[in-house]
Amino acid sequence: MNFWYSRSKIAYLLLPFSLLFWLISTIRRFLFQSGILSAYKAPVPVIVVGNLSVGGNGKTPVVIWLVQQLQMRGLNCGVISRGYGSQSEVYPLLVNAETDPVRGGDEPVLIAKRAGVPVCISPNRQQAIELLLSSYPCDVIVSDDGLQHYKLQRDIEIVVMDAVRGLGNGWVLPAGPLRELPSRLADADFIIGNGGENVYTDTAMRLVPHYAINLVTNEKRELNAFEQAIAIAGIGNPDRFFKMLQDEGIRLVSSQAFQDHQKFSADLFARFAPNVPLLMTEKDAVKCGRFAQQNWWYVPVDAEITGEKSAALLDKIEQMTQQGK
């Protein structure tokens, strides 16, 4: 919402509701931190990857990057997620690359596919962890989102933020885009700026596209082979995806932004010209395989996070798994 990024009249009108939201969330956090309400402590280290603001910060690529980096160090990882948008009949649910994204959720299926890691979804994070640990030998649990889920104790907090949009107008919902006040960042262990750095971040992340993959044939094609294309995106920040394609020299005949976690059907794509290549995100592609056309392609991206601080973070996690808790 545009008014989240300025202190407009609409934002001021919503400010009383934001004060109520802040009061409730602050009391709730205090109750868990003081021990008045009990929080679950897992028998292995728990790393939470989340964000302070809503929508499109690049959290999922960071989860995939983190899991892959820890796997390279010989650690067995498990991922838990609330499974937003999933329609499973039962929770907790173990998710793999072949799970129907309608049941498992688009992001959990994508993580399982890209990282080859066991994923468990449930609104109850404790149940998700317990099922993972009883099913797989996990050395560490990575929580996809859940920064504000204080029922779960965590060993490390990683916050991902859009370095361009920042924290918007600095107000909490609904007057602003924040779930908690900016001062909450002081408690985070590591802050990643998607697209650059700012005063809050420890390091920057680039989302790097390498090629496009055909949804039907799995053919890989360099992005510079696409002179023009139609682009669609059902993610938190679709404009970032469209700009990335344009930066690669692709002329967009048209672009269509859908809601985050959009449920796709063949009918939604009937409007697009069949003779023009259609490019989509990998997150969207996991939901389109059953009705994909020959000229549909998805563009996987890799999170590029470097520097001494990111290496120190990985060292710290590895040491936790060796020393116990």
From Swiss-Prot:
It is an enzyme of class 2 (transferase). The keyword ATP-binding applies. ATP binds at S53, V54, G55, G56, N57, G58, K59, T60. Transfers the gamma-phosphate of ATP to the 4'-position of a tetraacyldisaccharide 1-phosphate intermediate (termed DS-1-P) to form tetraacyldisaccharide 1,4'-bis-phosphate (lipid IVA). Transmembrane segments: none annotated. GO terms for biological process: lipid A biosynthetic process; lipopolysaccharide core region biosynthetic process. PANTHER family: TETRAACYLDISACCHARIDE 4'-KINASE (PTHR42724), TETRAACYLDISACCHARIDE 4'-KINASE, MITOCHONDRIAL-RELATED (PTHR42724:SF1). Its EC number is 2.7.1.130. InterPro entries: LpxK (IPR003758), P-loop_NTPase (IPR027417). This is Tetraacyldisaccharide 4'-kinase. The keyword Lipid metabolism applies. Pfam families: LpxK. It catalyses: a lipid A disaccharide + ATP = a lipid IVA + ADP + H(+). Keywords: ATP-binding, Kinase, Lipid A biosynthesis, Lipid biosynthesis, Lipid metabolism, Nucleotide-binding, Transferase. Belongs to the LpxK family. GO terms for molecular function: ATP binding; tetraacyldisaccharide 4'-kinase activity. Pathway: Glycolipid biosynthesis; lipid IV(A) biosynthesis; lipid IV(A) from (3R)-3-hydroxytetradecanoyl-[acyl-carrier-protein] and UDP-N-acetyl-alpha-D-glucosamine: step 6/6.
